[in-house]
């Protein structure tokens, strides 16, 4: 039909430059992948330890997703010998790479399945805590005065208590469940996130583009969501990456104290507090392997958080 340009046709632009109409269309998925690849390339070049940490964490995610495929045995099943008795406290060998616990269950399989609980608790609790803390920080930083005073006094009260003590108190009241643990850890994260976001908002408010948006008639919430929040994304991302490791440590501590995810669900902290602590002298591998898993994951999250901070903070980009 006349007047229509085929997708493969070439057209002449306003400056006389010929271009392909199909290529001129935006390709969001391609641009998204290009942005991700660009960010990864910068991370590898400038912060190789951060890139290695990201690789370790990606491997952990793959292990958690493919746990039914990668685990050599059922983590809940008692492995029996020829006489039908559980293979108890078998040290690491070719058949059981990380040994067996007092009930004959494979330790490696329980560690693999325990990564699921750690990741679920880590990502879910950090998401809840970061969202809540970001909301409180935005409101407190932009609307100063009485609102700021009330919110910050509440934040000071929560931060006066050690995080693990607050988590113990709330879990003791709400009871043991995975959902309660996620909510409790999110509640522990929120005050610190709120304080960081508030400071960032107070700094961003001093820029002239905020005054320009206000003069143009933008509503307060539009200024907060369209101008302040995008510029506060870098500190929020750094907080989340660092708190992921802390959330896993808190979950392991609660499990170690008997207030974590109830058995028989395998968790790294539960393995430390249960079989690992009771058999530390006779079978130290029951505590070594779960403890090593916790240490590696927390170290990887902390190193990734440091790398992101150095890359996103303008004051540290020259390092």
Segments (PLM) and residue ranges:
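Transmembrane alpha-helical segments of polytopic membrane transport and secretion proteins
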Residues: 1-55, 303-319
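Structural signature of transmembrane alpha-helix termini at the membrane-water interface
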Residues: 41, 63-73, 139, 194, ...
């Amino acid at each position: 039909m006349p007047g229509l340009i085929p997708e493969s046709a070439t057209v002449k632009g306003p400056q006389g430059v010929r271009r392909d109409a199909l290529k001129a269309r935006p390709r969001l998925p391609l641009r998204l992948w290009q942005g991700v690849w660009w960010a990864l390339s910068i991370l590898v070049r400038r912060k190789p330890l951060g890139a290695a940490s990201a690789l370790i964490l990606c491997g952990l995610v793959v292990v958690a997703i493919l746990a039914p495929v990668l685990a050599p045995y059922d983590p809940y099943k008692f492995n029996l010998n020829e006489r039908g008795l559980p293979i108890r406290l078998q040290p690491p060998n070719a058949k059981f790479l990380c040994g067996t616990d007092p009930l004959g269950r494979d330790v490696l399989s329980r560690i693999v399945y325990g990564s699921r609980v750690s990741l679920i608790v880590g990502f879910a609790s950090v998401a809840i805590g970061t969202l809540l803390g970001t909301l409180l920080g935005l409101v407190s930083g932009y609307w100063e005065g009485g609102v700021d005073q009330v919110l910050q006094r509440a934040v000071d009260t929560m931060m006066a208590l050690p995080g693990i003590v607050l988590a113990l108190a709330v879990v003791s009241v709400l009871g043991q469940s995975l959902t309660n643990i996620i909510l409790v850890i999110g509640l522990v994260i929120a005050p610190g996130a709120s304080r960081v976001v508030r400071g960032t908002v107070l700094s961003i408010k001093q820029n002239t583009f905020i005054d320009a948006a206000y003069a143009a008639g933008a509503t307060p919430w539009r200024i907060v969501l369209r101008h302040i929040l995008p510029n506060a994304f870098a500190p929020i991302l750094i907080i989340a990456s660092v708190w992921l490791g802390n959330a896993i440590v808190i979950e392991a501590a609660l499990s170690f104290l008997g207030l974590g995810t109830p058995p028989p669900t395998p968790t790294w902290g539960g393995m430390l507090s249960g079989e690992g602590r009771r058999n530390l002298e006779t079978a130290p591998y029951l505590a070594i392997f779960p403890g090593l898993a916790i240490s590696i994951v927390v170290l990887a999250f902390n190193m990734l958080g440091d790398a992101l901070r150095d890359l996103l903070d303008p004051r540290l980009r020259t390092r």
